[in-house]
Swiss-Prot record:
GO MF term set: glycolate transmembrane transporter activity; lactate transmembrane transporter activity; solute:proton symporter activity
Lipid bilayer topology: Multi-pass membrane protein
Annotated protein name in UniProt: Glycolate permease GlcA
Gene Ontology cellular component list: plasma membrane
Length: 560
């Protein structure tokens, strides 16, 4: 078997090598933010650039470069695109059945103020979905819900991407934290506890930030009590759950407490002016809210039973994806499990264990696995799809109409699915060629200032892979090693990789493609990217400052 060892300074120096490795990433930013190319076009050109640089600059064998691209593309189709197809299918069923009118009415009965609807649906309910499912489903579902409530697609997608910042680190029952523990050897409980001492600051900030994006300082002054209830209840619960229970449940508990607290609060309080129609403002790119009124929420004309039936697809989804991510269920499909025979593991030819990581990332050359797992029953998307099938019968859609809705879903998602495949192919080429490691080593070389840049490493990882879990797998060990070299807590920097990663989710090409697909913005990925990029950089800087202060000033906040 022919092997190839990654080269991290192929141009002779780390700085120049990093500049070359940056070319595909810079092009992707420019393609979306300046050239305004469609997502699948930008992704395809970026993929071609990354393959050429991998082969000619980083000396990756041609067959391995194309194998990495192929592996990334099929990974984009399964499990990522499958999750999105199932989530959008579920939403479209509620619309086709006419039940979304009841969902809309039930939300308006709590508040008809769109600023508060974003907090309730985008922030709190989205966090619940992130805790249970993760991997794109929360943004797809909450974005579609907000469009159904009357939000313009760009705002629905952008606001949900930014709202999804707070819960990502503990998503899918703590998988990102658990993976960080696996690759570093640090107790996941300690990593989760440390992240739980960083992210609550962001959790409090995000609701205020969302309102400010929609209605400026005026909106914050009018709605600050509700924003404080939503963010404060989430942050406090997030801290206590992560520090005293474990990394698996912070999103579930925080989201439930936030939803209940905000819903109950809105029963006894409402802003002086209720804002019900959002449009883009003329100054500072702010979102200004029109049609002020003080009429308050409109009582629902539907019974409790009708409301529960309308919401049942999302209730079933939450229950099923929670079951799907629990250890006993996963054990059924693990080696030795009762249903392991239903899982197909395919070793990627010309790639599996043929690419070797090298020092300083690892002590000795270590082969990288490349195994595609096709798990038709245990995949998260299947849980959502089963929820959709059950919903066909509960909502009375009918099998024939349900099949038609599914076909319509596939047709509407053809370009987003291609975009997802392309960006994952680019990400995998970047990873297997060593380009991502070269960029990481540049950041790691910042010495005593590295605690500030540490979250940006997680940010970069999530931008490249679309996943906080993958970012931790990619850079977790580098964070730990660098921490020991500069005499800083390794638990702090590994947690910072996770915390910083959440701020990159809103600009990840994968997330952008998912949000556009769910809100009917196919081909408008550049608009959404330009809408979220500055917020991503600001949030990453906030986490960087928090990490720097915890490393050298507020050392009492460290997990001992």
């Amino acid at each position: 078997m022919v092997t190839w060892t990654q080269m991290y300074m192929p141009m002779g120096g780390l700085g120049l090598s990093a500049l070359v490795a940056l070319i595909p990433i810079i092009f992707f930013f420019v393609a979306l933010a300046v050239l305004r190319l469609k997502g699948h076009v930008a992704g395809a050109i970026t993929l071609i650039l990354s393959i050429l640089i991998a082969i000619f600059a980083f000396k990756m064998p041609i067959d391995m470069a194309f194998a990495a691209a192929g592996y990334g593309f099929i990974y984009g189709l399964w499990p990522i695109a499958w999750i999105i197809v199932a989530a959008v299918f579920l939403y479209k069923l509620t619309v086709a059945s006419g039940q979304f009118d009841i969902i809309r009415s039930s939300v308006i009965s709590i508040t008809d103020d769109q600023r508060l609807q974003v907090l309730l649906i985008g922030f709190s309910f989205g966090a619940l979905l992130e805790g249970a499912a993760g991997f794109g489903a929360p943004v797809a579902i909450t974005g579609a819900l907000l469009v159904g409530l009357g939000f313009k697609p760009l705002y629905a997608a952008g606001l949900c991407l930014i709202a999804n910042t707070a819960p990502v680190a503990f998503g899918a029952l703590g998988v990102p934290i658990l993976v960080a523990g696996q690759v570093t050897g640090i107790d996941p409980f300690h990593i989760g506890a440390m992240a739980g001492r960083q992210l609550p600051f962001l959790s409090v900030l995000v609701p205020f930030w969302l309102v400010a994006m929609m209605d400026g300082w005026k909106g914050v002054k009018e709605t600050w009590p509700a924003a404080l209830v939503a963010g404060g209840s989430f942050a406090v619960t997030q801290f206590f759950t992560s520090n005293y229970i474990g990394p698996e449940l912070p999103d579930i508990t925080s989201a439930l407490v936030s939803i209940v607290s905000l819903a109950l609060f809105l029963k006894v309080w409402r802003p002086k002016n209720t804002e019900t129609a959002i449009s883009m403002g003329q100054s500072a790119g702010a979102m200004v809210v029109n049609k002020p009124s003080s009429g308050g929420p409109v009582p629902s004309e539907y019974s409790l039973g009708q409301i529960i039936r309308a919401w049942s697809p999302f209730l079933i989804l939450t229950v099923l994806v929670t079951i799907w991510t629990m250890k006993p269920f996963k054990a059924l499909f693990a080696p030795g499990g009762a249903f392991y025979s239903l899982v197909i593991n395919f070793q990627i030819p010309h790639l599996h264990q043929q690419v070797l990581k090298a020092a300083p990332i690892v002590a000795q050359p270590t082969p990288m696995d490349a195994v595609f797992k096709f798990d038709p029953l245990s995949a998260g998307g299947t849980a959502i799809f089963i929820a959709a099938i059950i919903s066909i019968f509960i909502l009375g859609v009918g099998i024939k109409k349900g099949i038609g809705v599914f076909a319509e879903t596939l047709i509407s998602l053809k370009w987003p699915i291609l975009s997802i495949g392309m960006v994952l192919a680019f990400a995998f080429v970047t990873n297997y060629s060593g380009m991502s490691t070269t960029l990481a080593l540049v950041l790691a070389g910042t010495g005593v200032m590295f605690p500030f840049f540490s979250p940006f490493l997680g940010w970069l990882g999530v931008f490249l892979t679309g996943s906080d879990t993958s970012s931790n797998a990619l850079f977790g060990s580098l964070q730990s090693t660098t921490a020991q070299q500069i005499n800083v807590s390794d638990t702090l920097l590994v947690a910072a990789n996770t915390s910083g990663g959440v701020t990159g989710k809103m600009i990840s090409p994968q997330s952008i493609a998912v949000a556009c697909a769910a809100t009917g913005m196919v081909g408008r990925e550049s608009e959404l990217f330009r809408y979220t990029v500055k917020h991503s950089l600001i949030f990453a800087s906030v986490i960087g400052i928090i990490t720097l202060l915890q490393a050298y000033v507020f050392t009492g906040m460290l997990v001992s």
